[in-house]
């Protein structure tokens, strides 16, 4: 199977409500790396069909100009997820985000239905990538097995709100309640060779706190962050983009490795 763009840059993933066509028609103007077209929590129960209709036509008709199109489907404990998958694949979504992932079997179950949909709609097998949202203590504890569950899986994302509820605590604003999950998830992702994204930050009146949080998760090793507002994109991109000093250092390391390799070849000859 081919897995296009599995390692592409994903610093920013901006959530968009599929129930509101006006929000999903031109988010590329804000230049996020990925958009998260949401069929789950943002969509009212009696609007799921309408949201899927909007999603399909957006995927088919709108040129998102290279922005990755991720779709968050409803959880496996709902009656919606199977049809969500069919619409995602039929429309040509790049990636499907699996909500409330707790085990490798959750990923396997979704993958089976994605493969069936690819065959049904004539999409190349393996062309639809997967990512897993960990939203519970069980999911976080199983992070490594989830990360290793599928060749399609690009990475895991923390869903802080639901995780905090499952932890039986509250969101403090300091992030202390999320640190254990963050550390376990990034270690699991790196061990498995996949990417890892931090949870959303919803207080748009505290952009200074948001900036400090983004700096912290970058230092922890995260690849990026889920976002709720276009104002947050530039902050994330600035922090996650290498400085000129870092680029020069990396180029120097690559050059030295290349020179060592050439010297080794000459010695063998």
Residue ranges and their predicted role:
Residues 1-268:
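Expand to "…catalyze enediolate/carbanion chemistry for C-C bond making/breaking, isomerization
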């Amino acid at each position: 199977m081919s897995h296009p763009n599995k390692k592409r840059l994903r610093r920013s993933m901006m959530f968009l409500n599929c129930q509101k066509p006006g929000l999903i028609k031109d988010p590329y103007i804000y230049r996020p790396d990925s958009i998260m077209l949401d069929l789950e929590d943002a969509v009212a129960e009696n609007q799921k069909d309408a949201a899927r209709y909007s999603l399909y036509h957006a995927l088919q008709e709108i040129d998102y100009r290279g922005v990755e199109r991720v779709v968050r489907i409803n959880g496996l404990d709902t009656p919606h997820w199977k049809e969500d998958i069919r619409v995602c694949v039929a429309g040509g979504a790049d990636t499907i985000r699996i909500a409330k992932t707790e085990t490798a079997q959750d990923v396997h179950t979704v993958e089976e239905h994605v493969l069936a949909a690819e065959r049904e709609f004539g999409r190349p097998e393996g062309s639809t990538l997967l990512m897993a949202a960990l939203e519970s203590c069980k999911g976080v504890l199983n992070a490594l097995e989830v990360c290793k569950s599928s060749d399609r899986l690009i990475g895991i994302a923390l869903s802080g709100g639901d995780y905090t509820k499952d932890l039986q605590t509250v969101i403090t604003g300091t992030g202390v309640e999320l640190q254990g999950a963050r550390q376990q998830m990034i270690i699991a992702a790196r061990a498995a060779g996949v990417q890892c994204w931090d949870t959303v930050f919803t207080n748009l009146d505290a952009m200074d706190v948001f900036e400090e949080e983004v700096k912290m998760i970058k230092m922890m090793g995260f690849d990026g962050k889920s976002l709720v507002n276009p104002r947050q994109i530039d902050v994330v991109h600035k922090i996650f983009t290498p400085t000129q000093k870092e680029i020069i250092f990396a180029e120097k390391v690559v050059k030295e490795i290349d020179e060592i390799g050439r010297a080794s070849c000459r010695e063998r000859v």
